[in-house]
From Swiss-Prot:
This is Sugar fermentation stimulation protein homolog. Pfam families: SfsA (PF03749), SfsA_N (PF17746). GO terms for molecular function: DNA binding. CDD domains: SfsA-like_bacterial. Belongs to the SfsA family. InterPro entries: SfsA (IPR005224), SfsA_C (IPR040452), SfsA_N (IPR041465).
Length: 237
């Protein structure tokens, strides 16, 4: 995924109300930007941090700038981290289509945002007449408290636990059900669960795994020009 226009640099003043942040641009202008991230963003929202913003194509949008990247140091030097949770579905779909995720390759069709169950949508659905339906749910990972070890979630997520339950139900039907955890921290070497931050999610994960839900860890390569899936990394559970 390449950013369609050059990103705009700035410094974070503060993040508030989850979806808003105040930023000072290089020319000294202060502006409010959209934050497409409902998580706690632990370690990523320190005032003064360098940030990169994208400009919306829709000129009529109330907040034309969106927060895309932040510079953070998790103990191994400064690096860029992706904070926009709208991108992971596309990033994983691109990686699957390119054959970069062997466990999910070889399907005849890839569809996104497909309705399933009673009132849900699956991020990615892989279809092939020769094998069971494969439903893929994607989660963005941007928490790191130990160098190299990324964690999910960074706050309580009842919605995330619901997704695990729904995937478990699909596995019970004989469909293939997969959770993909995508780290937008490029220095991640493995991904695990932040069970201390959301014990209920940890329990839901364990139940889903027992029912046959698979878990795949991926890590991104990030720069101001774009983001792409770089590698498969272990899921430690």
């Amino acid at each position: 995924m390449r950013f369609p226009t050059p990103l705009i640099q700035g410094r974070l003043i503060r993040r508030y109300k989850r979806f808003l942040a105040d930023v000072v641009l290089a020319d000294g202008t202060e502006t409010t930007v959209h934050v497409a991230n409902s998580g706690a963003m632990l370690g990523l929202d320190a005032p003064g941090s360098r940030v990169w913003l994208s400009r919306a194509a829709n000129l009529a949008r109330k907040l034309p700038l969106s927060w895309e990247l932040v510079e953070a140091d998790f103990g191994a030097g400064a690096e860029l981290v992706g904070v926009n949770t709208m991108h992971p579905n596309l990033l994983v779909a691109e990686a699957i289509a390119a054959g970069a995720v062997p466990a999910l390759s070889g399907y005849a069709r890839l569809r996104r945002e497909v309705k399933y169950g009673l009132s849900s949508r699956i991020d990615i659905q892989l279809e092939d007449e020769a094998r069971p339906l494969c439903l893929v749910e994607v989660k963005n990972v941007h928490l790191m408290r130990t160098p190299g070890y990324a964690e999910f979630p960074d706050c309580v997520t009842a919605r995330g636990a619901k997704h695990l339950e729904e995937l478990g139900a699909e596995a019970d039907k004989g469909n293939r059900a997969v959770m993909v955890y995508l780290s937008q921290i490029g220095s991640a070497r493995s991904i695990g669960l932040a069970r201390d931050l959301d014990p209920a999610y940890g329990r839901a994960f364990d139940r889903a795994r027992e029912r046959g839900v698979e878990a795949i860890g991926l890590v991104c390569r990030i720069d101001p020009e774009g983001i792409e899936v770089a590698d498969i990394i272990p899921m430690t559970g």
